[in-house]
């Protein structure tokens, strides 16, 4: 598996410093569990952060800085070190890492998939995050997602299958970061359904009027 699309330096820095909320952190940790290159970059940031902590006086450190750093280390350690244990069943067949599987049922047949139309299904992860939503998506092979833009940032991590859009081609392990009003229309590859994690901070802006009218019902 060759990963071509990686985390931005800004995302890695925010994650390492504990600045990301739960939903965004899940997406970053999911990619880190797949990508050795980004794990190495993350380790360097942690090393730099550790040096800064050592050189700082107690007055310069916030009360929760240590807990933030330790929390990030625990998340990555769990998603990487426990992946075999957590993914010994159905999750491994979809490439879903433990950091995501922990939010899901033990059996894919028991997942509360919600039909969004056109064969697309979702499961919204139950997090405590009030600023962003994380959802597992299943999109049929060969399907085009309706053309849309965004009201904010969107992160998508591919677990199985893949898609292409105006920004490139994405496969297992890749992460796509979309900002602001960027427009695209993902097209899932033929031959295999696409299973991915998508995190958004605001509803999508669909070009098709009918899809926009249905948004309150499908919740995306």
Placement of each model-derived feature along the sequence:
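Short acidic-glycine-tyrosine-enriched beta hairpin
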Residues: 165-185
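Double-stranded beta-helix
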Residues: 197-220
């Amino acid at each position: 598996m060759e990963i071509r699309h990686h985390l931005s330096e800004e995302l890695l820095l925010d994650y390492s410093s504990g600045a990301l909320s739960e939903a965004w952190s899940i997406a970053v940790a999911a990619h880190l569990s797949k990508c050795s290159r980004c794990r190495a970059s993350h380790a360097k940031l942690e090393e730099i952060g550790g040096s800064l902590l050592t050189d700082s006086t107690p007055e310069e450190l916030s009360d929760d800085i240590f807990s933030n750093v330790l929390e990030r280390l625990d998340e990555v350690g769990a998603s990487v070190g426990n992946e075999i244990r957590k993914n010994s069943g159905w999750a491994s067949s979809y490439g879903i890492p433990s950091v995501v599987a922990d939010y899901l049922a033990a059996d894919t047949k028991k997942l509360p998939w919600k039909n969004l139309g056109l064969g697309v299904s979702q499961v919204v992860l139950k997090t405590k995050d009030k600023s962003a939503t994380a959802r597992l998506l299943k999109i049929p092979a060969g399907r085009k997602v309706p053309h849309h833009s965004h009201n904010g940032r969107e992160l998508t991590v591919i677990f199985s299958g893949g898609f292409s859009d105006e920004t490139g081609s994405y496969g297992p392990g890749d992460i796509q970061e979309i900002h602001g009003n960027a427009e695209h229309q993902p097209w899932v590859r033929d031959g295999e359904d696409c299973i991915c994690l998508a995190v958004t901070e605001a509803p999508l802006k669909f070009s098709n009027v009918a899809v926009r009218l249905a948004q309150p019902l499908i919740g995306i």
